[in-house]
């Protein structure tokens, strides 16, 4: 009978967890508090509401020591008027705000990407996404800029809701599995978009699994297409091969070699 490294994988996923009492979280929250206060001061009457979303809100963000591209997503919902402003207007407002408070200050940098304005502060990216909100068929609907210069609908809490439901349904193994997979993804140069990877992993069926079985299952479900870059296909194939080797050494009751193969894909 094969031995298990379930506890080892769970501990490893905890290592990839950005803990609430960590110094990194304290710095992030301090910067967020200042950022929100500055938004209130500068654009207060123009803003309807603002809220954190993304991996930070879903509790799947990785520490910077693992993922150099970890970022904090902030949705800024503007008040709309009878005179409809374009998405670019709201983005420009955020850019002017960011330049005023953060450009070349505190060692920070401001970048106008799409559809956000990014403030790089203390090695953390804070992505400010402009949005508007309208009542449609009795329900509030959020819109963010699209690449055509107009608006597109969005539901920033959709993945969080699905993830929370899945994590509860499958005995709290989904978030650890996501952290393991995201750690592999970022250390291999992001063959998958982080958001799309989380969405995919959230939708899998982990019935009866523990972290080990669920992680091995999730690796097996990764796929690529003929049109994907060869580098992506190679990285996914390499991960699958490494996990096959892990399974083989577990069958041989050799946890040392199993872990060696595991860490060909996952950071220690």
Where are these regions (language model features)?
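Extracytoplasmic/secreted envelope proteins and their assembly/folding machinery
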Residues: 29-32, 36, 91, 95, ...
């Amino acid at each position: 009978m094969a031995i298990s490294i379930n506890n080892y994988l769970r501990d490893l996923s905890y290592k990839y967890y950005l803990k609430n009492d960590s110094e990194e979280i304290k710095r992030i929250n301090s910067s967020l508090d200042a950022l929100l206060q500055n938004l209130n001061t500068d654009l207060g009457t123009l803003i309807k509401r603002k809220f954190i979303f993304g991996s930070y809100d879903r509790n799947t963000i990785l520490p910077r020591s693992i993922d150099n591209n970890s970022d904090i997503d902030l949705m800024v919902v503007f008040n709309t008027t009878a005179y409809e402003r374009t998405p670019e207007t709201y983005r420009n407002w955020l850019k002017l705000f960011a330049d005023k408070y953060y450009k070349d200050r505190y060692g920070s940098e401001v970048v106008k990407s799409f559809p956000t304005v990014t403030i790089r502060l203390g090695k953390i990216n804070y992505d400010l996404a402009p949005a508007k909100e309208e009542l449609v068929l009795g329900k509030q609907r959020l819109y963010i800029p699209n690449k055509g210069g107009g608006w597109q609908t969005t539901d920033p809490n959709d993945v969080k809701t699905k993830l929370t439901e899945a994590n509860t349904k499958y005995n709290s193994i989904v978030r650890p599995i996501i952290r393991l997979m995201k750690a592999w993804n970022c250390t291999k140069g992001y063959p998958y978009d982080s958001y799309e990877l989380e969405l995919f992993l959230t939708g899998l069926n982990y019935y009866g699994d523990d972290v080990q079985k669920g992680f091995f299952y999730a690796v097996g479900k990764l796929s690529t297409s003929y049109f994907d870059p060869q580098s992506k296909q190679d990285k996914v194939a390499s991960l699958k091969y490494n996990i096959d080797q892990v399974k083989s050494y577990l069958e041989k009751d050799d946890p040392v070699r199993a872990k060696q193969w595991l860490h060909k894909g996952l950071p220690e």
